[in-house]
From Swiss-Prot:
Comment on protein domains: The beta-hairpin motif is involved in DNA binding.
Annotated protein name in UniProt: UvrABC system protein B
Name of encoding gene: uvrB
Gene Ontology molecular function, alphabetical: ATP binding; ATP hydrolysis activity; DNA binding; excinuclease ABC activity; helicase activity
Pfam families reported for this sequence: Helicase_C, ResIII, UVR, UvrB, UvrB_inter
Residue ranges annotated for the Helicase ATP-binding domain, each copy included: 26-183
Binding site for ATP: 39-46
SUPFAM superfamilies: C-terminal UvrC-binding domain of UvrB, P-loop containing nucleoside triphosphate hydrolases
Length: 670
């Protein structure tokens, strides 16, 4: 029997949650393809969904509009389902510059990227969970609609080993190379293996902290064990194990040879076309680049940019949808689109932007026409393959309402009895000084403030201004990388700083109960940042606090402002009426501050190590065990050398200082 979801929570459904859960389950069981959950900010939509998932017991994919919200959802689901597989799938690029050609300046931009190894491991862990288990909740960004390796080839390439199996060490090593693992005798890191006599150590690409040891005797698997690659200490013994490929883009050798033949045919056709049009430079360019890729594929089984040949590698026909994360989903999967009013338009926009860039590469001989099939899904393709879907939003758009045929499940009453925030409109002429005085009122109460501006420059200038007046403030915008965004929000909740300034990221889903004031600067500047939906979403960030207030600074009241204020006031009236009728006294939310990127990792012994944050190098370690200190020294030294190798010398210096402090601590307890 499949493992069931086990929901862990100290709370029971309350407010509008019980009827919302019941309606969702009834709709899904009766075969409704689309449902919309309209839940106000702070009404516990995530808890409602977790209850529905647990009762239905179906694998679930949750799409979030950005990495920050995906990380927050991942953390919440990890808390609700600690005994099940909660996984995280977002783009693994910290920095990404796709290859492009600008005809006007005749300049070709090479592909350049910085891959986050931790997120790459989480992606591989996510697909592994989908293939192995049914009790999976997978939180993903729109990255889920981009091309991924074909699941059929991925499954074919897996290496299965069983104790007692007859297999030579040479055969195992060859299979590991086929899976794109690298041999490294000096350092066992993720995606590598080492050989010592008849003992093969493998650090699986999808594993974070545990490696495998395969012990052979006379071409027979004698023992399979799990060990800590940092200390070498054994953890467990296994009867069988499956080693998954290092990347999603692995292909069996025979498929690569078939693909190479097909690529050669297309190359000859393309060369002929260019010569007929007297495009000699383009003909020479496509020949040189493609023949180099073919040679790499013949020799190594892969090449840089192998995804551009995905049509041939996956055996799909021209124009057919590429394999994506959706191909890895089980047939009975459930799809939840969070903040659907933002996420759905994103899904529709991805294809066109990608297409226009690739057409230039194809037209000027940098890529074969088949590269156009390495793309995100078109919106129609997404609609076709999407399983049963629940749209979730406080402000659903017409698309979701039409898809649900007007059947909206409403969740307006909060379990805590909290009301929507009080709204005030104040003059724009004195907005910065007025904001400063409002911040100073909240600092003694240990309450936090969110401020939303219209531009990055304005956010940065306002941060500097507040610093000059002794206010601890930070800004959050698109230039801040994924992990750092999560850390900034965590630091705000912990009180390391008091004011967070943003543009478009301080909206959907941000769950910060400590925030009692949301200030919207230049609220009368009509546009997508100050539309009715944007204003409702932004003001909603103060709805999780007992003293929640939203201040709109404006010279006039626009149509969007008027509508947003009316919706909020109507909800507030409804919530207040419910509280009076049921004798409910509003209670502020008290939510534990977790580092979502650490959730699910096997923690070291409690009390031994105060865990530093993901992006924090000078962590304040209070370690009482010598073994833990030695382990942390080894880890910090490894990170120090990695930073130095990437020419990130400032980070390397921080890790060096950390190692020095740990050595001092080791001496003091010795």
């Amino acid at each position: 029997m499949d493992k069931r979801f086990q929901l862990v929570s100290q709370f029971s459904p309350a407010g509008d949650q019980p009827q919302a859960i019941e309606q969702l389950i009834n709709g899904l069981k009766s075969g409704l393809a689309f449902q919309t959950l309209l839940g106000v900010t702070g009404s516990g939509k995530t808890f409602t969904l977790a209850n529905a998932i647990a009762k239905l017991n179906r694998p679930t994919l949750i799409l979030a509009p950005n990495k920050t919200l995906a990380a927050q959802l991942y953390g919440e689901m990890k808390e609700f389902f600690p005994n099940n597989a909660v996984e995280y799938f977002v783009s693994y690029y910290d920095y990404y510059q796709p290859e492009a050609y600008v005809p006007s300046s005749d300049s070709f931009i090479e592909k350049d990227a910085a891959i986050n190894a931790h997120i790459e491991q989480m992606r591989l862990s996510a697909t592994k969970a989908l293939l192995e288990r049914k009790d999976v909740v997978l939180v993903a960004s729109v990255s889920a609609i981009y091309g991924l390796g074909d699941p059929t080839a991925y499954l074919q390439m897996m290496l299965h080993l069983t104790v007692g199996e007859i297999i030579s060490s040479r055969e195992i090593l060859q299979r590991l190379v086929d899976l794109q693992y690298n041999r490294n005798e000096t350092e066992l890191s993720r995606g590598t293996f080492r050989v010592r006599g008849e003992v093969i150590d493998i650090f699986p690409a999808d594993s974070e902290k545990e490696a495998l040891r395969i012990e052979l005797f006379d071409d027979e698997v004698e023992q399979i064990s799990v060990f800590d690659p940092l200390t070498g200490q054994g953890i467990d013994k296994l009867a069988r194990v499956t080693v998954y490929p290092k990347t999603h883009y692995v292909t069996p050798r025979e498929q690569i040879l078939k693909a190479v033949d097909a690529i050669k045919v297309e190359l000859n056709e393309r060369k002929k076309e260019f010569l007929e049009q007297n495009k000699l430079l383009e003909e020479q360019r496509i020949s040189q680049r493609t023949l180099y890729d073919i040679e790499m594929m013949n020799e190594l089984g892969y090449c840089s940019g192998i995804e551009n040949y995905s049509r041939y590698l996956s055996g799909r026909s021209e124009g057919q949808a590429p394999p994506t994360l959706f191909d890895y989903l089980p047939k009975d999967a459930l799809l939840i689109i969070d903040e659907s009013h933002v996420t759905v338009p994103q899904i529709g926009a991805m294809y066109k932007g990608d297409r226009s860039r690739k057409e230039n590469l194809v037209n000027y001989g940098f890529r074969l026409p088949s590269a156009l099939d390495n793309r995100p899904l078109k919106f129609a393709e997404f609609e076709k393959i999407a399983p049963q879907t629940i749209y979730v939003s406080a402000t659903p758009s017409d698309y979701e309402i039409n898809k649900s045929q007007g059947e909206i499940i409403r969740q307006v009453i909060r379990p805590t009895g909290l009301l929507d925030p009080v709204i005030e409109v104040r003059p724009v002429t004195t907005q910065v000084d007025d904001l400063l005085s409002e911040i100073n009122i909240r600092l003694p109460l240990k309450e936090r403030v969110l401020v939303t501006t219209l531009t990055k420059r304005m956010a940065e200038d306002l941060t500097d201004y507040l610093h000059e007046h002794g206010i601890k403030a930070r800004y959050l915008h698109s230039d801040v990388n994924t992990v750092e965004r999560v850390e900034i929000i965590r630091d705000l909740r912990l009180g390391i700083f008091d004011v967070l300034i943003g543009i478009n990221l301080l909206r959907e889903g941000l769950d910060i109960p400590e925030v009692s004031l949301v200030a919207i600067l230049d609220a009368d500047k009509e546009g997508f940042l100050r539309s009715e939906r944007s204003l409702i979403q932004t003001m909603g960030r103060a709805a999780r606090n007992l003293n929640g207030k939203a201040i709109l600074y404006a010279a006039r009241i626009t149509g969007s402002m008027q509508k947003a204020i009316k919706v909020t006031e109507d909800r507030r009236e409804l919530q207040n009426k419910f509280n009076i009728e049921n004798g409910i006294i509003p209670q502020g939310l008290s939510k534990q501050v977790n580092d979502v990127m650490q959730l699910g990792q096997k923690n070291l012994k409690k009390g031994n190590l105060k865990q530093g944050k993901v992006a924090e190098y000078k962590a304040n370690y209070q370690i009482h065990s010598e073994q833990d200190i030695l382990k942390q020294i080894a880890l910090s030294e490894k990170q120090m050398f990695a930073c130095a190798k990437n020419l990130e010398f400032e980070k390397a210096a921080l890790f060096r200082d950390e190692v020095t402090k740990l050595h001092e601590q080791l001496v003091s307890i010795g």
